[in-house]
Each structure stands twice: as structure tokens, then as C-alpha cells.
Amino acid sequence: MKNIMRNKEVKLFAVIFAVFIASMMLFATTAHAATVTTKNMPSKSVCVGSSKTLAKPNVSGFKWKAINNTYYTLTTAGKLTGKKVGTASFSVTCKNVKYVYKVTVKNRPKLNCTSKTIRVTEKLNLKVLNAGNSTVIWTYKNPKVVYDGVGYGPGTTTATARCAGVTMTCKVTVKDYNGSLAKKMAPKANANVLSAFDKLGFKIKYDPTVNYGGCFNAHERTITLRFVGDNTIYHEMGHFLAFVAGNVDRSSDFAAIYNSEKSKFTGINRSYATQNATEYFAESYHDYILQPTETKKKLPKTCSAISDAVKKVTPTRVARVKEIYGPFWK
């Protein structure tokens, strides 16, 4: 009888234990499913035919999975490659978190042209098509030929645009300006001064690599400027005027004017402009052209000297300058 009771107890215990184990397994399964959460990750974009490597979230054990859908492919190394324009999401589950990524595939950016010819001081006007809201970064191989999208000097160079992971290039040829560059870039200067500049064979050059704003060189017959469109050209034209009028900035008469009125000069380049009579004459010409009324009021003697210098630039004077300096000019 005791054996029968013991067998029943054993069987009952076995049934209870089995039910307990089953319930624990069910609870464990239910609890695991309930703790999975979804986390939307920052959207990604890629262009058709382009690739980028996605950065993993800072989660231990996270691994990319291989995906090949209509719009893009993803490798286990995280390399995302665009196939067709469109949008699709994928997810990766790691440690009870479902990471969801929305991927948009866009048209590949391209330049509006792959070769272009412009002249010095002209804008390149290249455009990136299909750029959308993506940032475009421009670089130019030779800044002495093209700088900041503007022709700076004759020659050939390459313009490069980088946008949305795509690199595009355009061959650019820059030719000399067809006409008087002095008249184009310093249109407010005195007509006879500009005419003398051209007749004596002087040239304007641009070089963004120099460490100064402008430089007049009578021996080389050049005005070198750092930036296209800078009003510094009027300062350098002041140097040219002084030279062609007979180096009037170095005369004793102008030295007396310089000493009497330099303290009245209030331009933004005051320290540089008043260091000597030569720079004072050039910068005063700059103001004489661009701010005539104010400058004549503040510096009457200086402006009178500049006006006299302008009057000296006659065809006869130009011919004389050419006769004297011609043998030294190449």
C-alpha cells in the first residue's frame, strides 16, 4: 500500500514539475518578446552608382546584414551602394533593440558642362545638377588660372566639385581679356590716364597667392592685384599716374603738401597711406576717384596736386615717357 502511495506521489511531483518548467519557458519567451524595442536611426542617403560606408551605432555586438533590394545594396561591412532612385528602410536587431534605417537613393549629381572657356575676370558659372540640399565644395587646381570661380590668368586648369559623395571635374581654359582690362576694372579712373596705361603697354595681372593687395611695377609695366574686383586697383593707378606725370609723388612740391595734409587723411588705410609721400599720393588718388567730394574738402592741396598730375598726361607726355623708358622695357 505504501509503495502504491509513493508511486502516486512521485508521478504527481513529476507532473507538477513538468507544468512548472513549461510555465517558466512560456514566461521566459513572453518576457523576451516584450522587451524588444524599436529605435529609428538618422536617415541615410546615397546617389545612384555611388557608395558610402555607414557608421555603426556604439553598441557591442552590432553587425550589419547583407541587403539587396530594388534601390540599394548593403554589405556586412556596412557599404551602402545606390541602385535606383527611391526610398526603402531596413532594420538590424541587436540586444533586444531593433535599429531601423531609412535610406533614400537620389539621382547622381553632375556638372552642367565638362569643359569651358572663359576670359580673365569672367565668372565660370559652373553648376551642379541634382545637388538638392547637399553641400557643394569647389576646388581649383591652379588658383592663378581660376580662383573662387573667376578667371584670374591665362592657362588651363581643372575645376572640381564634390557633392553627396560624388566627385565631378571640368576642364577650364582661361584666355586673356579681349580689350582694355584697365578700362573694365577701373572705369572711374580718368580717361586719359587709362588711355596712357594701354598705350604704354602696361598690363593688369591677378595672383591670389601673393601676400599683398596690389603692386605697381614700372619696370615690368604691370599692376598685380590679389583679387578681381578689388578697388585696390585705384591705388595702383595712382602710382601709375604719379609715374607717367613725371614722378610727381617724389617732388619737393608734393613733399610739402604731404607734410601739411597727411594728418587730415582719415581713410581706413591711414597708417599705410601716410607712411610716405608715394603711398600717400596713390591712396589719395584712390579716394579722389571714389569719394571726390569728401576728399577734396578734407585734402584740398593734395587733390589740386592730383588734378595737375592728371592734366600732365597728354599724348605728348605719353610719347616722351615711351621714348625715355622704351629701351628698358622688354
Protein language model regions, located:
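Extracytoplasmic soluble-region selector
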Residues: 2-3, 32-177
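Active-site acidic/histidine clusters and adjacent loop/turn architecture
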Residues: 182
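Active-site-flanking segments in enzyme catalytic domains
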Residues: 187, 191-330
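Intrinsic disorder/low-complexity segments
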Residues: 10, 14, 20, 47-48, ...
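Gram-positive cell-envelope targeting signals
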Residues: 1-35
